Regions:
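Short hydrophobic beta-strand segments
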Residues: 2-6, 164-167
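Active-site helix-to-loop segments that bind/position phosphate- or nucleotide-bearing substrates
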Residues: 4-95
Length: 252
């Protein structure tokens, strides 16, 4: 099984790491091409390009100037312990037993506007560059187009015939994958909550649930669709009436 998730805007470079293990990102050559473009942007340009405040633009301009390779444990940090958003709250990687890290490393991939595709223990430096950013790179009109061939080829290389491919990323990030070119079908779980008597997808809960689904897969060694349907963390249950084919809906 392979799983893809989105990165997070929030980063944590302070928390003590539970392991000294790390790996090298696969696409630093391509990341340097993207970085060269974004490094040239002034704070005001970053603010407009990313629709962020002047304060955030200044922070990310500084990050862009300081970003450099090679990555080492002294100047970079494993991705799964660095991203700090709702998905990562649900995943709670810090409490995954170290003997399960190899399972996480094998199954999980993180889509990224700067790094393309990251393994959990891949080193990364601080950045902010969402996949939907309308920024031409090399011959590509945007980041989706730049990364799509590389990311899709990498996933196909890793996916074995008959293996499940679970999409827990946002639409913005998953659009960097050429679904038609994948050699296996895509399983897409969705998570909905009852609120005021109506079933809704509430962003915070849905993002956290995506992370919890990754954790469930790691905890239970899930391999089949039936295994996925057993997801029951924090009150979610599989809803057979709302689900159809490879679209799995969980409600609570």
């Amino acid at each position: 099984m392979k799983i893809v998730i989105s990165p997070a805007k929030s980063l944590n470079f302070e928390k003590e790491l539970p392991t000294s293990q790390y790996t090298e990102p696969s696409f630093l050559k391509e990341a340097r091409i993207v970085h060269k473009v974004v490094k040239q942007k002034k704070p005001a340009e970053l603010s407009e390009l990313m629709s962020i405040s002047d304060k955030l633009a200044d922070l990310n301009w500084k990050r862009n100037q300081e970003w450099k390779t090679p990555f080492t444990p002294e100047n970079a940090r494993p991705a799964v312990y660095t991203f700090d958003g709702d998905v990562y709250t649900g995943l709670d990687a810090y409490t995954i037993p170290l003997e399960k890290l190899n399972v996480l490393q094998d199954k999980l991939r993180i889509l990224s506007g700067l790094y393309g595709l990251l393994k959990p223990l891949d080193l990364m430096q601080a950045y902010r560059l969402e996949m939907g950013t309308k920024m031409p790179v090399a011959e590509s009109k945007n980041l989706h187009d730049f990364w799509k061939p590389t990311v899709t080829k990498a996933l196909n290389k890793e996916l074995k015939k008959g293996e499940l491919f679970v999409n827990l990323a946002s639409n913005e990030y998953f659009s960097a994958v050429d679904v038609k070119a994948l050699k296996v079908p895509v399983i897409t779980p969705d998570f909905k909550d009852y609120k005021d008597g109506k079933l809704k997808m509430i962003s915070f809960f849905a993002k956290k649930a995506r992370g919890m689904m990754v954790r469930y897969i790691i905890d239970t060694n899930a391999e089949t669709i039936d295994d996925l349907k057993g997801f029951n963390y924090e009150g979610y249950q599989f809803d057979a009436n709302l689900s159809k084919g490879n679209h799995l809906v969980f409600t609570r």
